[in-house]
Each structure stands twice: as C-alpha cells, then as structure tokens.
C-alpha cells in the first residue's frame, strides 16, 4: 500500500519536473501501435511481455512508471539502442518505476513483463 501512495506522489511530482525529458512525440508499442508520450493504457497477457520504443534526450532525467491492476507481478526493463540493460524494477508488485539519465540522445526500449497467469491492465507514464 505504501508503494502505491509513493508511486502516485511521484507521478504528481514527476509530471511537473520530468515532463520534457522524452523528445519523441509518440511512443511506438509492439502491442498496440502508437500511443501518447505522457500516458499509455494497455493490457499485457499472462506470461507475456509488452515492448515499446521511444527517444530520450542526453542529460535529461527520464522516468518510466507503470501501475497495474493488482492481479499479477509486473517487471519493468529499460534497454538502450545497443540492447544494454539500463535499469530494471523486478520487485514483487505491479507498480515498477525506472529512472535514469541518458548519456546520449537515442532510442530506448521499454519492456513490461507479466509474471502472472492472468492478464494485467496497466497504465504507463514516460517523463
């Protein structure tokens, strides 16, 4: 419960601090096509991974935050354009958060992995 409240507080704070960190006007996702930079609502199937791609600017702190529906554990992974793992949140919950500062402007990949046996509806924010 504490993490949910902390996540919501971070979302409110981050919307004012990190809103300009992503340079792309859209995030492209393998699961649903195209969606808004600031907020994406989606469903990841049981034991599956949703994948998104976006461009982030060098030197600007970037945050990806996911809040699931509470049914399963969601893990979050961030990769750079060379497929190097940049950050991950693999806690046993469905509210993962990753924050990093890119060393160069480039393409990044977001992977949201559902470890459960049922689907999970989630909202993702990129700041």
Kindly give the residue locations of the regions a language model identified:
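Bacterial N-terminal signal peptides
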Residues: 8-16
């Amino acid at each position: 419960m504490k993490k949910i409240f902390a996540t919501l507080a971070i979302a409110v704070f981050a919307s004012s601090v990190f809103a300009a960190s992503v340079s792309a006007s859209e995030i492209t996702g393998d699961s649903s096509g195209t969606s808004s930079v600031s907020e994406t609502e989606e469903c990841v199937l049981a034991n599956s991974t949703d994948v998104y791609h976006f461009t982030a600017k060098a030197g600007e702190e970037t945050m990806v935050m996911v809040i699931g529906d509470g049914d399963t554990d969601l893990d979050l992974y961030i990769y750079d354009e060379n497929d190097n793992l940049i950050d991950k949140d693999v806690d046993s919950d469905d509210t993962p958060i990753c924050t990093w500062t890119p060393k160069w402007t480039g393409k990044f990949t977001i992977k949201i992995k559902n470890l459960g046996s049922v689907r999970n509806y989630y909202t993702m924010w990129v700041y």
